[in-house]
Amino acid sequence: SRYGVGYDKVDVAAARELGILVSIAPGANSNSVADLAMALMLAAARHVCPMDAAIRAGQNSKPTTGVEMWGKTLGVVGTGRIGKGVIQRAAGFQMKVLANDAYPDQAFVEAHNGTYTDLDTLFRESDFITLHAPYTEETKNMVDSRRLKEMKSTAVLVNTARGGIVDEEALYERREDVAEEIN
């Protein structure tokens, strides 16, 4: 057994040769991951980690409130079990939902203040973006330099899916660009 889901870190061919059954337990951690995605968005929005570090260092005189999530636009890439769980949780914040999925569930998303859209629009218009897509050749580096530049400089990106969906070098470069814009 391993922490997480998926086969991308398992040598399935070797396991098969050794007679080891490899399987997944779909949905086993869906609620936990949806909770985590919301917690990460809240922590980023409210500057929880920097404020904690400042307070621990005795630097609690610089107030920062961050931003509210209430009424903001949430982009959800992948509306399977986890993506739907995040959408349900976002309803409590009256968030507008922009969703994208190869297999859209129109009725579900519309019932939760959302609409399906293309990825470019989702990245351009969202205040928070959360990734819940599988890692495939089609999704590899899906979040690339171009998409990162389309994002609002204040937008928050949360990836609880596979790391390879985000081009990490492009993410680092965009982070540096945004830091220069702010300073």
Predicted feature residues:
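An N-terminal-biased, well-structured beta-alpha scaffold segment characteristic
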Residues: 1-23, 124, 144, 149
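Short, well-ordered coil/turn residues at beta-beta hairpins
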Residues: 2-3, 132-135, 159-160
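Short beta->alpha connector loops at strand-helix junctions that form conserved
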Residues: 3-4, 19-31, 101, 119-120, ...
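NAD(P)H-binding Rossmann-fold N-terminus in SDR/SDR-like oxidoreductases
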Residues: 6, 81, 85, 165
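Short glycine-rich, flexible loops that bind phosphorylated cofactors or substrates
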Residues: 8-9, 136-138, 165-166
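Rossmann-like dinucleotide-binding domain for NAD(H)/NADP(H)
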Residues: 18, 22, 145, 149, ...
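Phosphate-binding beta-alpha-beta segment of Rossmann-like dinucleotide-binding domains, i.e.
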Residues: 18-20, 25-73, 85-88
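Rossmann-like dinucleotide/phosphate-binding beta-alpha-beta segment
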Residues: 63-153
